[in-house]
């Protein structure tokens, strides 16, 4: 679908999407990995983001935070590489996502893209 509809923006969201941040055995999809599980090479999300500029990631759900909390070194690199296609949102009233993002010592322009510039850009289109 990403290839067939290059002018359509797709937002990846929820456990069925975020499980693919890592190259883990797909049998793990029934038991979402806990935090501190290393992200293994071969994840579909980074692969698809590199190939399809119309794919964006929505980190609003707990699954987004869990995926990003697994391996903080990987997450910092991932967010810097794809900062122009990560969307911050929340569907719960806590600060865990902000605490995670703010703990990674990301450059201010990266945080601004994630927190609001990407959404502004998409909504303006």
Language-model regions, residue ranges each:
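Catalytic pocket-lining loop regions of alpha/beta-barrel enzymes
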Residues: 1-87
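Mid-to-C-terminal alpha-helical segments outside catalytic/metal-binding sites
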Residues: 81-87, 92-125
